[in-house]
A protein has these predicted regions:
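Arg/Lys-rich, positively charged N-terminal/basic patches that mediate binding to nucleic acids
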Residues: 1-21
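Residues that recognize and position ribonucleotide moieties
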Residues: 3, 47, 86
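Anionic group-transfer/hydrolysis microenvironments
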Residues: 8, 50, 80
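Short, charge- and proline-biased low-complexity linear segments
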Residues: 20-36, 84-90, 95
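A short, surface-exposed loop/turn module that caps and links secondary-structure elements
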Residues: 28-58
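Short, low-complexity Ser/Thr-rich regulatory SLiMs
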Residues: 53-55, 66-69
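Short, surface-exposed coil-to-beta transition loops
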Residues: 59-64
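Enriched for short, Lys/Arg-rich terminal
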Residues: 67-102
Length: 102
């Protein structure tokens, strides 16, 4: 099981979208299945997973962007609703990951 770490951006967005129970369910799931999401091509291993929210299934839910470090940490970078934006460009995700890894 991975340790889950979240950025301030992710925390703020999750608080607006999920109930505490939905948040807890996601964190438990991603900690135990860190490779569940698809690797975003060209992002150096950043992953995207679809997750439902109240009143919407996965298709109408959110996309969570994260990556797994070699230290068995899962970093939750950001999240967005599909109706907000389709995708985040891979080069932006790569920059975020590099900033966290130093």
């Amino acid at each position: 099981m991975n340790t889950v770490i979240e950025t301030n951006i992710f925390s703020a967005k999750a608080a607006k979208v999920w109930t505490p129970k939905q948040y807890e369910d996601f964190v438990v799931y991603i900690a135990s299945t860190p490779n569940a999401g698809e690797v975003v091509p060209g992002s150096s291993g950043v992953r995207k997973i679809r997750w439902g929210k109240d009143g919407a299934g996965k298709r109408g839910g959110v996309r969570v962007i994260y990556f797994n470090s070699a230290a068995k940490e899962t970093w939750l970078l950001t999240m967005y609703a599909k109706n907000e934006r389709e995708n985040i460009p891979a080069h932006e995700l790569k920059k975020i990951k590099e900033a966290i890894n130093g």
